[in-house]
Amino acid sequence: MLLAVLYCLLWSFQTSAGHFPRACVSSKNLMEKECCPPWSGDRSPCGQLSGRGSCQNILLSNAPLGPQFPFTGVDDRESWPSVFYNRTCQCSGNFMGFNCGNCKFGFWGPNCTERRLLVRRNIFDLSAPEKDKFFAYLTLAKHTISSDYVIPIGTYGQMKNGSTPMFNDINIYDLFVWMHYYVSMDALLGGSEIWRDIDFAHEAPAFLPWHRLFLLRWEQEIQKLTGDENFTIPYWDWRDAEKCDICTDEYMGGQHPTNPNLLSPASFFSSWQIVCSRLEEYNSHQSLCNGTPEGPLQRNPGNHDKSRTPRLPSSADVEFCLSLTQYESGSMDKAANFSFRNTLEGFASPLTGIADASQSSMHNALHIYMNGTMSQVQGSANDPIFLLHHAFVDSIFEQWLRRHRPLQEVYPEANAPIGHNRESYMVPFIPLYRNGDFFISSKDLGYDYSYLQDSDPDSFQDYIKSYLEQASRIWSWLLGAAMVGAVLTALLAGLVSLLCRHKRKQLPEEKQPLLMEKEDYHSLYQSHL
């Protein structure tokens, strides 16, 4: 049944999204530095005739950067995307996309006016058909060439400043693998020189917003590819895990019986080929990953360097991260202390919040623990566990946002490592998104997590809000009732006082009780109250 669904999907759909729009990679586009493709609905650039958007100059932030990358004009990702384009579509209202043909996250419908909240669920809560459908969608993405996007296989300089385009087709799944490689690759300085201390999505403030957008775009493309608008990425809750409980053939793949570094032949993913994993080879040739298959997925969970990562994260580790009030601190890189981002990413201890270069914890611990393809930053997205892992990391980010409710100004405006300032555009996304745009609640982006819905403090606020609104509507009646009650209380108190005086006159003074009867005391107390 699963194979029948998969083959049906493979023959039915051809779509994608990700990096360089196919419509914008001609020599004309590259030399004119313009990416404003027509929207299919009216054939005008950016859907301008329909009011969806228009072609505009890109306004880049001039906020100062941190000292980690001491070069200028040597890397295509600097001041993204200005090396390739200085004009792109600027979409209006709730429209989004490289040609304004899509809706912003959280909006649906032909005019993008409908709000919708999707829920990401624990993979262990999926039924067998739901789980098999998820695996079928992954395989479909792995076998569907993108009709919308291509990947560059050379630098802008190697393309002779755009006059000789160098781009390849790629399937949808590997497109996102390539994006994760490209955003974290070393800087190629020419000759045999490289610069390793550069990463536009890790080791700095944009780590969490970048991966949030990455998952949203991945999710959105699977929805388009399959026609399943309710699709969401499941998460793996790894808190307190003693082993990789999703590393079975029923889920993400068990171990090969004769080669522990490979997946079991019975695994859904055992035949997958990986891409973008040979970083040193690319560096030595001053070249980019071109999407060529490079061998099978490798994974040997638990047989890693235990001196660096002695255990998987605990619930207490997560709670300590959430208790940290600062999103970012100090140098805003992997040496930051008491930084929620740096602690969750795994460069600071989840016991103290102090940066520790000798240990890999939290998010990093899972990558190290997998001991294979997922353990290398650039190629880690080849392993589909990457999606489940980062969905859960994003849920922890969401918990922190809900607990501390930071203003957007909490996200650093300046002096972060290159590509990580609040107004910097995220590499390598087209359409363009800023880091600060995703420093907001997931609900504002149209999704939530199943395990957060039960504990969300907002749910109590929403529950009581209706009662407060009703109270405001009947406030004048309540005020009038209170005044009448006060008058009646005063009259009753006067009557009780008269009765007491009359009683004192009837009893000799020495026979009068020191206290009233219990019932009388209660009535008087309540009346005075």
UniProtKB/Swiss-Prot annotation:
Q: Which InterPro entries match?
A: Di-copper_centre_dom_sf (IPR008922), Tyrosinase/Hemocyanin (IPR050316), Tyrosinase_Cu-bd (IPR002227)
Q: What class of enzyme is it?
A: oxidoreductase
Signal peptide position in this chain? 1-18
What would you give as a GO molecular function for this chain, any one? protein homodimerization activity
Keywords per UniProt: Albinism, Copper, Glycoprotein, Melanin biosynthesis, Membrane, Metal-binding, Monooxygenase, Oxidoreductase, Signal, Transmembrane, Transmembrane helix
Tell me which domain of life the UniProt entry assigns to the organism this sequence originates from: Eukaryota
Which residues take part in binding Cu cation A? Answer: 180, 202, 211
Give the start-end ranges of region Disordered. 287-313
The membrane topology of this protein is: Single-pass type I membrane protein
- Residues on Cytoplasmic side: 498-529
Cofactor(s) required, per the database record: Cu(2+)
GO biological process terms on file: melanin biosynthetic process; pigmentation; response to blue light
Question: Where found, per UniProt?
Answer: Melanosome membrane; Melanosome
Q: How is it modified after translation?
A: Glycosylated.
Q: Which residues cross the membrane?
A: 477-497
**Residues exposed to the Lumenal, melanosome side:** 19-476
Q: How is the cofactor bound?
A: Binds 2 copper ions per subunit.
List positions binding Cu cation B. 363, 367, 390
Broad class of where this protein is predominantly found = membrane
Report whether Transmembrane helix shows up as a keyword of the record.
yes
In the record, the note on similarity to other proteins reads:
Belongs to the tyrosinase family.
Q: What does this protein do?
A: This is a copper-containing oxidase that functions in the formation of pigments such as melanins and other polyphenolic compounds. Catalyzes the initial and rate limiting step in the cascade of reactions leading to melanin production from tyrosine. In addition to hydroxylating tyrosine to DOPA (3,4-dihydroxyphenylalanine), also catalyzes the oxidation of DOPA to DOPA-quinone, and possibly the oxidation of DHI (5,6-dihydroxyindole) to indole-5,6 quinone.
How is the quaternary structure described? Forms an OPN3-dependent complex with DCT in response to blue light in melanocytes.
Q: Kindly identify the disorder that the protein's record connects it with.
A: Defects in TYR are the cause of oculocutaneous albinism (OCA). The only known albino gorilla, called Floquet de Neu ('Snowflake') had white hair, pink skin and blue eyes (zoologic park of Barcelona, 1964-2003). No differences were found at the amino-acid level but the activity of this enzyme was lacking in 'Snowflake'.
- What's the protein here called? Tyrosinase
- The source organism is Gorilla gorilla gorilla
Recite the lineage of the species: Eukaryota, Metazoa, Chordata, Craniata, Vertebrata
What gene name is listed for this protein?
A: TYR
